[in-house]
Amino acid sequence: MASRRKSTTPCMVLASEQDPDLELISDLDEGPPILTPVENAKAESVSSDEEVHGSVDSDNQQNKKVEGGYECKYCTFQTPDLNMFTFHVDSEHPNVVLNSSYVCVECNFLTKRYDALSEHNLKYHPGEENFKLTMVKRNNQTIFEQTINDLTFDGSFVKEENTEQGESIDVSSSGISISKTPIMKMMKNKVENKRITVHHNSAEGTSEEKENGVKASQEENAESVSSSALESNTSTSTINRVHPSPASTVVTPTAVLPGLAQVITAVSAQQNSNLLPKVLIPVNSIPTYNAALDNNPLLLNTYNKFPYPTMSEITVLSAQAKYTEEQIKIWFSAQRLKHGVSWTPEEVEEARRKQFNGTVHTVPQTITVIPTHISTGSNGLPSILQTCQIVGQPGLVLTQVAGTNTLPVTAPIALTVAGVPNQTNVQKSQVPAAQPATDTKPATAAVPSSPSVRPEAALVNPDSFGIRAKKTKEQLAELKVSYLKNQFPHDSEIIRLMKITGLTKGEIKKWFSDTRYNQRNSKSNQCLHLNNDSSATIIIDSSDETPEPPAAAASQQKQSWNPFPDFAPQKFKEKTAEQLRALQASFLNSSVLTDEEVNRLRAQTKLTRREIDAWFTEKNKTKALKDEKIEVDESNVGSSKEEPGESSPGDETVAPKSGGTGKICKKTPEQLHMLKSAFVRTQWPSAEEYDKLAEESGLARTDIVSWFGDTRYAWKNGNLKWYYYYQSSNSSSLNGLSSLRRRGRGRPKGRGRGRPRGRPRGGKRMNTWDRVPSLIKFKTGTAILKDYYLKHKFLNEQDLDELVNRSHMGYEQVREWFAERQRRSELGIELFEENEEEDEVVDDQEEDEEETDDSDTWEPPRHVKRKLSKSDD
């Protein structure tokens, strides 16, 4: 205990002498809990290098003291050991303290023994020496509350002026600051727990108190409190009580978050971070806190943008700043505690969504201008803002707060609202002296007077309230060079620009999109000649790098240009079919958007300007006009066969230049065979495969693309029966069969279509049933079943799947066919129809004649349809 700071003030007081008015304020009272100063006796921490001042007792007698030790007030006992002193009081003066307890306010740790409290301090507060013990009495129980001295993160003491109303006193009492109360106990409800309070100096205070407040911020005061009953010793660093002042302006998050474009968020700039209300928690009470991160510009910039980073952002920051993720997380948590930022998860998501979507909501805005003598007279703090460029929406009201000794503002402040044409003047009014400061709008910000406002010295960080920062000259130069090469950058180019410029992928894509948009709508293509003037006004828009047009041009485009466009997310999947049809029709007419076309589409589709522009940009980038076609009615597709020479609407759209008649030439059997074989290999050929097919088949590439699209549609609807045949057959057998058919076409004219006389019925076809199926078997399907039945005489369930695949019939159809054969066998009638073999041969002949049909979907011949309809009947 030798290293612990000690006080000569005894820790114990007789219970009978305890003033009942000195009890702790009930937690049920309204407002923040404020501990009444204990004026009786207390043990306070005193620095080892500071002198210990003796206190005057009720008889005004000076007591002897032991340097760094304890002495008993009621006898001559003196000891440097607190444990021995406690034992002495318990044994010699048993009525002094009854039922004592020790509480660590920082950790809510409660114990009956001081030894346990010491062990707790060694374990959870290692190296901490700034403890202060305060004795309070509650319900006949003496409680010693241990708190830590009010050191802020930068190691300085915070003093707040005592503006107590009523009976004036010359000296202020020492107590526990409200900021030392645990955060969860500071406010009583959810809304108050997140309030941000900006304290102004009370205009009702005397000038004498103001002068004392200025001096108190520059030096340390040692104040002693006289008491008629007991003596007390104060520490050299006095922590004054905090009283609610009517001059404080309370800003709730509901007023701050929607108005992210207000000037109040400028207070969160890093240059003025030490001026904000701080939660007074020592740095060494936070585990693994690294103070070196306080000077890291990357972390400071990220915190100014958004105080709640995501895990991915923390990972990136860890890689860039060369610190661990845990250190960065703790640093962000400490900064939020330091600046009093406490948002719920819902508010964090809402603020993040508004920031990255770029929405700026209209909120009544009031800027309070405080004269310099008022803003610095109460607490000695420097001006909150030196110079500021106000970036926001119209309707700003500039007011001046008047105190008891009102002085005129030295010079009017000129405020420029960016993005609003002809917005040059801002109203200014004078507030009467009797009007309290609480009558101002909920969203207020303190702005000191300054001779002029320089736009180039803007301390407002636009990213801190959802507005993107203006790009630097180097970033714009890289973007312009890339834009001149390609207006639609690829992913590799975007990644390269991200590495060079440090911008995000969304910012780069948005810059390209807005540059294309501005180039289309600019008469003289001035979008590339960017204005590099440092004093240019920040435009709250994605086109912040484009110059403002001349006054005449600005007046002409005032109706069509919105300074606050809607930044709706580009969700293409949410567009309805009617919206897509309208966009497609407009794109087919012209791929270049005009203002009239955009306005028409906005009225027709109810889409935003950004969504329409993004959709057209994506269409131009992918060059997908040739691949996308207007689908025909599903009831007609697949149910009726296209006549020879008839083309689909998609074919007319894709290949309108073939003869000018909208018809495409017939495909030869070899071309169809080549396309079908390629379709079996892949339904989605690559660009190289399309080129190869066009070269080998001699067809136009657009015809091949159109054929694949129609074939995919037919395959999806189950109207592509030749697919299984090509899938199970090899190319050599197909080539052989096609060559045999071509030789068969050269038969004599007098020869009929019947079977050769010397050819036995079904001779070769019954040798083996598992040979490569011919087109005849594929067309009817029953020939495969017949060969299987002649070989096995019954249906084996293990072969059912193979029979279904080879015959292209359903499972029930195959079973019914074999059941019919079994029924015929039991009745003793003919197992097979007499004309079945002839139909097969005739089918071969019909196939020879219809092979040149370039229909994309296959259908059985008419005579097979008639036979199938009879079997169904």
Swiss-Prot record:
Residues 272-432 are annotated as: Required for dimerization. SMART domains: HOX, ZnF_C2H2. SUPFAM superfamilies: beta-beta-alpha zinc fingers, Homeodomain-like. It comes from the Eukaryota. Transmembrane segments: none annotated. One of its GO terms (molecular function) is zinc ion binding. GO terms for biological process: negative regulation of DNA-templated transcription; negative regulation of transcription by RNA polymerase II. Forms homodimers. Heterodimer (via HD1 domain) with ZHX2 (via HD1 domain). Also forms a heterodimer with ZHX3 which is a prerequisite for repressor activity. Interacts with ATF7IP and NFYA. Interacts (via homeobox domains) with DNMT3B (via PWWP domain). This is Zinc fingers and homeoboxes protein 1. It comes from Mus musculus (Mouse).
